[in-house]
Amino acid sequence: MKIALIAHDRQKPLIVKLATAYQPILAQHELFATGTTGQKIIDATGLSVKRFKSGPLGGDQQIGALISENKMDLVIFLRDPLTAQPHEPDVNALIRLSDVYEVPLATNIGTAEVLLRGLDQGLMAFREVVHDQDSNPINL
């Protein structure tokens, strides 16, 4: 699966801890991240992460573009709900796209853990089933 990892500045230490704790699970998947978040995860874990621009410089939009092309399967976006963000419209657009394209999205550590544990247990096959049905329609 293709997984995006994003975190606001005050949440970056937390997403690094998450990536460290779930490194064996994350290592089995293709990882993407905004610039600084991705570098911090790489430095802490050695995981392979495709990095985009920093969120305020368009990284959120780059990940949103992948979502809109059905090229992203899961998004972990640890937001800082107590600090105003200069790129808040980009953040809202990314969340909206996740809803439109039915991409599982975690915006806090509790939900992120549930998604990663579910992924590890094979409980997140919905998108794969939908993609298989879309590419192999059954004619009745």
Swiss-Prot record:
Pfam families: MGS. One of its GO terms (cellular component) is cytosol. Belongs to the methylglyoxal synthase family. Keywords: Lyase. It comes from the Bacteria. GO terms for biological process: methylglyoxal biosynthetic process. Catalyzes the formation of methylglyoxal from dihydroxyacetone phosphate. One of its GO terms (molecular function) is methylglyoxal synthase activity. It catalyses: dihydroxyacetone phosphate = methylglyoxal + phosphate. The active site is at D60. Gene3D superfamilies: Methylglyoxal synthase-like domain. This is Methylglyoxal synthase. Its EC number is 4.2.3.3. InterPro entries: Methylgl_synth, Methylglyoxal_synth_AS, MGS-like_dom, MGS-like_dom_sf. NCBIfam families: MGSA (TIGR00160), PRK05234.1 (NF003559). Residues 1-140 form the MGS-like domain. Substrate binds at H8, K12, T34, G35, T36, T37, S54, G55, H87. It comes from Latilactobacillus sakei subsp. sakei (strain 23K).
